[in-house]
């Protein structure tokens, strides 16, 4: 029998953590942060205690209390076993927005994360421009005797363990033990978003991820809808944050309005948008070109573009 357990993402914005169990296969779809829970207990400069983070997150109901799921250095230090084998076969990541990926650093490094090339590079950008640990797990509680004969805490690359990241190919089915997975691109405000169709022993499950119909890749979303209709789904997990919202401006409308505003502005024009929204970056880039201006971006976004350019699969896409 196939079961789905929702450990977040229901009646909430974000926090998606869907556990699919079929036969002996267990797969999480996303492992993200709930904005409402984080806002209730934490703030920008106040988070879970490093020395007791798992227990804090369990006590507050933010993370599911599942043995074998979390990184062993945390689990052992916080008396949550840490020596058992994991029963989780993989995490399927729809995309690299924090409400879908923020808690990946808590997971065991030997649980494979399946994602798109774009999502992997965005996670790499997080790691290399902040203290995040999406692609590596830096062991926190290792003590050693230093040259002076006193005890020191091991830090840096010498305690970094690479996570197992598997890049899937859009539209190409692959298997995680008994579950077949078809990743299909959809349009959203960050590159590399993929919906999933899972084929289990008991039927097919669709997960829309976050999707929209008004961006530069709306055709991808429409093709996914068609694929769902063809797949005879038994269950559809659908993102519904703005399901009843009135139609909004398209990205091309935004581009046109920005051109008009910038052309009617003297002197410096300053804009704000999410660093990883490269479609919005393109809108402002086109507006800058059409108004004979130079577009200046921040270093994190510049580095993300560099990572994309270094990828054979993504070079020239942005």
Predicted regions and their residues:
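Metallo-beta-lactamase
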Residues: 88-99
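A contiguous, basic/glycine-rich beta-loop/short-helix subdomain that forms a polymer-engagement track
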Residues: 299-318
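A generic "binding-loop/recognition-motif" signal
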Residues: 97, 119, 301
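Short, surface-exposed beta-edge/turn micro-motifs
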Residues: 15-17, 294, 312
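Loop-centered beta-sheet repeat module
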Residues: 267, 277-295, 300-303
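His/Asp/Glu-rich metal-coordinating catalytic cores
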Residues: 2-12, 16-90, 105-279, 283
């Amino acid at each position: 029998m196939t079961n789905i357990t929702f450990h977040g993402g229901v009646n909430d914005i974000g926090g998606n953590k869907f556990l699919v169990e079929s036969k002996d296969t267990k797969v999480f779809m996303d492992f993200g942060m709930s904005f409402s829970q984080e806002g209730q207990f934490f703030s920008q400069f106040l988070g879970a205690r490093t020395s007791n983070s798992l227990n804090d997150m369990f006590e507050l109901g933010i993370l599911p209390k599942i043995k074998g799921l979390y990184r062993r250095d945390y689990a052992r230090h916080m008396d949550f076993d840490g020596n058992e084998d994991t029963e989780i076969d993989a995490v399927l990541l729809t995309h690299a927005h924090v409400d879908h990926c923020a808690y990946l650093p808590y997971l065991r490094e030997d649980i494979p994360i399946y994602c798109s090339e774009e999502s992997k590079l965005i996670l790499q950008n997080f790691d290399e421009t902040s203290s995040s640990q999406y692609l590596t797990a830096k062991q926190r509680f290792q003590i050693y005797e230093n040259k002076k004969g006193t005890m020191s805490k091991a830090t840096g690359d010498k305690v970094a363990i690479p996570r197992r990241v598997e890049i899937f190919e859009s539209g190409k089915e692959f298997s995680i033990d008994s579950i077949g997975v078809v990743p299909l691109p959809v349009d959203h405000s960050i590159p590399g978003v993929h919906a999933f169709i899972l084929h289990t022993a008991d039927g097919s499950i669709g997960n829309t991820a976050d999707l929209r119909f008004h961006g530069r890749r709306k055709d991808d979303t429409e093709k996914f809808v068609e694929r769902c209709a063809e797949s005879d789904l038994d269950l559809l997990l659908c993102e519904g944050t703005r399901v009843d919202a009135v139609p909004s401006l398209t990205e091309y409308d935004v581009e046109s309005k920005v051109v008009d505003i910038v052309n009617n502005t003297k002197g410096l024009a300053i804009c704000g948008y999410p660093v990883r929204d490269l479609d919005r970056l393109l809108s402002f880039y086109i507006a800058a070109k059409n108004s004979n201006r130079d577009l200046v971006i921040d270093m994190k976004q510049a580095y993300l573009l560099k990572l994309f350019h270094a990828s054979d699969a993504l070079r020239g896409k942005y």
